[in-house]
C-alpha cells in the first residue's frame, strides 16, 4: 500500500506544480485520489467475490439501491478501510445471497422497506464530521432521499422476486446507517 501512496503523492505533487496549486489544494487532490483509488479497490474486491459466489446481479441490485438512496441521505461510515471491506462483503454479497437462497418472503421485505422508508423520512440526511452537509442543502437532500425511496417502493411493486427483496435490502442497509446510534456526539 505504501508504494501506491507514494505514486499518489508523486502524482498530486505533479498536479500541484503543473497547476500552481497551494498546499491546501494539493491536500484536497491527494485525498481525492486516495479515496477514489480506495473505492476502486473495494469495488473490485466486492464484485470479484460476488462473481465467485455467483451473486453479481444480486450484489449489483442491492448496491445500486443503497447507492442511490445514500447519495442524498448520506449516513455513517465504517471506522476503517478493513472494516469497510468486511462490511461490503457481508452486506452486499452474503446478505443478498442469503435472501435469495433462503427465499425470504416478499411480504416481510415490503415491511422492512417501509420501516426503512420511515427511518429515511426521520433521519435523512445524516451528516458526519468528515462529510458535513451545508444547512442550505439539507432540505433538498431530505426531499430527494424521500423521493428516490418512494421510486424504489413503487418499483418494488413491478419487479419479480428476488429483485424486489434485494431493492428492499438496499434501502434497509442505507436506512440503518442513518440511525443516531452510529454517531458519537463529536461526529454530528
UniProtKB/Swiss-Prot annotation:
EC number(s) stated in the UniProt entry for this protein: 3.4.-.-
Topology relative to the membrane: Multi-pass membrane protein
Subcellular location: Cell membrane
Keyword Magnesium: no
A GO cellular-component term linked to this record: plasma membrane
Chief location category: membrane
TM annotation in the entry: 49-69, 82-102, 104-124, 163-183
Record has Protein transport as a keyword: no
InterPro entries documented for this protein: AgrB
Record keywords: Cell membrane, Hydrolase, Membrane, Protease, Quorum sensing, Transmembrane, Transmembrane helix, Virulence
Any one biological process term the GO annotation gives: quorum sensing
GO terms, molecular function: peptidase activity
Enzyme class: hydrolase
The organism's place on the tree of life at top rank: Bacteria
The family this protein is said to belong to: Belongs to the AgrB family.
Function: Essential for the production of a quorum sensing system signal molecule, the autoinducing peptide (AIP). This quorum sensing system is responsible for the regulation of the expression of virulence factor genes. Involved in the proteolytic processing of AgrD, the precursor of AIP.
Protein name: Accessory gene regulator protein B
Lineage: Bacteria, Bacillati, Bacillota, Bacilli, Bacillales
Gene name for this UniProt entry: agrB
Amino acid at each position: 500500500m505504501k508504494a501506491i501512496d507514494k505514486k499518489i503523492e508523486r502524482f498530486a505533487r505533479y498536479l500541484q506544480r503543473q497547476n500552481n496549486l497551494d498546499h491546501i489544494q494539493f491536500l484536497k487532490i491527494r485525498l481525492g485520489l486516495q479515496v477514489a483509488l480506495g473505492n476502486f479497490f473495494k469495488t473490485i474486491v466486492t464484485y470479484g467475490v460476488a462473481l465467485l459466489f455467483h451473486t453479481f446481479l444480486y450484489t449489483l441490485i442491492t448496491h445500486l439501491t443503497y447507492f442511490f438512496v445514500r447519495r442524498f441521505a448520506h449516513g455513517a461510515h465504517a471506522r476503517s478501510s478493513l472494516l469497510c471491506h468486511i462490511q461490503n462483503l457481508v452486506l452486499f454479497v452474503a446478505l443478498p445471497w442469503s435472501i435469495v437462497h433462503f427465499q425470504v418472503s416478499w411480504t416481510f421485505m415490503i415491511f422492512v422497506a417501509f420501516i426503512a422508508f420511515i427511518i429515511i423520512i426521520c433521519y435523512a440526511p445524516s451528516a458526519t464530521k468528515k462529510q458535513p452537509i451545508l444547512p442550505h442543502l439539507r432540505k433538498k437532500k431530505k426531499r430527494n432521499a424521500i423521493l428516490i425511496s418512494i421510486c424504489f417502493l413503487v418499483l418494488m411493486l413491478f419487479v419479480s422476486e428476488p429483485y424486489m427483496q434485494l431493492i428492499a435490502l438496499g434501502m434497509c442497509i442505507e436506512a440503518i446507517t442513518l440511525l443516531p446510534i452510529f454517531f458519537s456526539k463529536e461526529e454530528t
